[in-house]
Amino acid sequence: MNWSHSCISFCWIYFAASRLRAAETADGKYAQKLFNDLFEDYSNALRPVEDTDKVLNVTLQITLSQIKDMDERNQILTAYLWIRQIWHDAYLTWDRDQYDGLDSIRIPSDLVWRPDIVLYNKADDESSEPVNTNVVLRYDGLITWDAPAITKSSCVVDVTYFPFDNQQCNLTFGSWTYNGNQVDIFNALDSGDLSDFIEDVEWEVHGMPAVKNVISYGCCSEPYPDVTFTLLLKRRSSFYIVNLLIPCVLISFLAPLSFYLPAASGEKVSLGVTILLAMTVFQLMVAEIMPASENVPLIGKYYIATMALITASTALTIMVMNIHFCGAEARPVPHWARVVILKYMSRVLFVYDVGESCLSPHHSRERDHLTKVYSKLPESNLKAARNKDLSRKKDMNKRLKNDLGCQGKNPQEAESYCAQYKVLTRNIEYIAKCLKDHKATNSKGSEWKKVAKVIDRFFMWIFFIMVFVMTILIIARAD
């Protein structure tokens, strides 16, 4: 029983395969006959219309498969496209009943007439025409030609907002030799097909609208139609933010810190020059990938502004260092500088001398209080205090002479002791004078150093605010 079922199944399979081979043989036979009949007297050199005054319509459809490269410096877009062209050939029609119902065949595209549709704004020396793939020929003469092509087109790149820029690249297709009265071109859809697009790592595609244009050129009076596909691109800016923008922001915030370095360290100017060199390197990196146009990119403007701030900070640092190292030969601090810088600005910026309390300058307040009290005393009381102090000094001088034996001794001993007293007095006066001069010199230098320190702190905060505001403005401009 099982053996009989197996024989029946084998017979059915053999019969079906035989019928399939017979059908394929019949199709191949009729296709060959159709091919011979169609191309017996056919010429692909002439426009396939029965009436030469009739316009041949060509429908164009573009499918964007991949963006291979966007060369901003040379302003060239390299794209991988699938190009579909559909037109009607009046000489390639047949009756399906005469060829066993055969309604379409596939033949090499170079055997039939093809519209000379080219990319008007191509930017390479090599041919960017579609590949010679087969065409699908239908019984009513409708020809469909699908072919891939790698195109290089010129694209005007606007780098004003780089790396947050949007670009619009046009792909303009049209007939090179036929005017609009001979071959008219239409777009199959309102936009290019993006269903098979492979996502690009650098660019986002936001659309590809298509528009038909009819243009009359100066060379010819006839109209020339074309179809322009506008590729809307938005740059993925993460790479440039991480590698170009964030390092620049961090480096720019280092520039104000040069004012915080002690002047005696000798590294203030070196830090500014080092930061300036780093910014120059980043500026050169941006210049290498940008086209040589008059539009300065947004990040380039940020670099230039930052470099200007760093240059200004370095120049001001040199000025402050000159103030810091004012020595004994320098003039005293002017009165206005004492009031504005040492009295008010130092308190606002929390700049104090070494050993002086930053929170509660107690001794300074006591000294100011005593000065105010003495200034309020009457003139008579001040005169009495001075006379009392003078009499006290004379009394102490008399006691010192008695202790040294200048009085109450014989004349020879008194003269000897008085000479020693005079020498001792002169030495003490000399030492006191030296100490006073040294203190005055140190006080003058300390005042200039404090002036320099206050100016340093003032410029540090000013430059911090400027860098912060500039960064916010750049980000807001990008948005």
UniProtKB/Swiss-Prot annotation:
Sugar-bearing residue positions: 57, 170
Residues in compartment: Extracellular: 23-238
Regulation: Activated by a myriad of ligands such as acetylcholine. AChR activity is inhibited by the antagonist alpha-conotoxins RgIA and GeXXA, small disulfide-constrained peptides from cone snails.
Described function: Component of neuronal acetylcholine receptors (nAChRs) that function as pentameric, ligand-gated cation channels with high calcium permeability among other activities. nAChRs are excitatory neurotrasnmitter receptors formed by a collection of nAChR subunits known to mediate synaptic transmission in the nervous system and the neuromuscular junction. Each nAchR subunit confers differential attributes to channel properties, including activation, deactivation and desensitization kinetics, pH sensitivity, cation permeability, and binding to allosteric modulators.
Bilayer topology annotation: Multi-pass membrane protein
Signal peptide residues on this chain, from the entry's feature table: 1-22
PTM per Swiss-Prot/TrEMBL: N-glycosylated.
UniProt xrefs under InterPro entries: Neur_chan_lig-bd (IPR006202), Neur_chan_lig-bd_sf (IPR036734), Neur_channel (IPR006201), Neuro-gated_channel_TM_sf (IPR036719), Neuro_actylchol_rec (IPR038050), Neurotrans-gated_channel_TM (IPR006029), Neurotransmitter_ion_chnl_CS (IPR018000), Nicotinic_acetylcholine_rcpt (IPR002394)
Entry's family note: Belongs to the ligand-gated ion channel (TC 1.A.9) family. Acetylcholine receptor (TC 1.A.9.1) subfamily. Alpha-9/CHRNA9 sub-subfamily.
Tissue: Expressed in cochlea, keratinocytes, pituitary gland, B-cells and T-cells.
A Pfam family of this chain: Neur_chan_memb
GO biological process, alphabetically ordered: chemical synaptic transmission; detection of mechanical stimulus involved in sensory perception of sound; inner ear morphogenesis; membrane depolarization; monoatomic ion transmembrane transport; negative regulation of ERK1 and ERK2 cascade; positive regulation of cytosolic calcium ion concentration; regulation of membrane potential
Compartments it resides in: Synaptic cell membrane; Cell membrane
Lineage per the UniProt record: Eukaryota, Metazoa, Chordata, Craniata, Vertebrata
Site (Key residue important for potent inhibition of the CHRNA9:CHRNA10 receptor by the alpha-conotoxin RgIA (AC P0C1D0)): 146
Species whose genome carries this gene: Homo sapiens
Name of the protein: Neuronal acetylcholine receptor subunit alpha-9
Binding site for Na(+): 191, 193
Effect after changing residue 86 to T: The CHRNA9:CHRNA10 receptor is 250-fold more potently inhibited by the alpha-conotoxin RgIA
Gene Ontology CC terms, in alphabetical order: acetylcholine-gated channel complex; cholinergic synapse; neuron projection; plasma membrane; postsynaptic specialization membrane; synapse; transmembrane transporter complex
Transmembrane segments: 239-259, 269-289, 303-323, 458-478
Keyword Ion transport: yes
Record PANTHER family: NEUROTRANSMITTER GATED ION CHANNEL (PTHR18945)
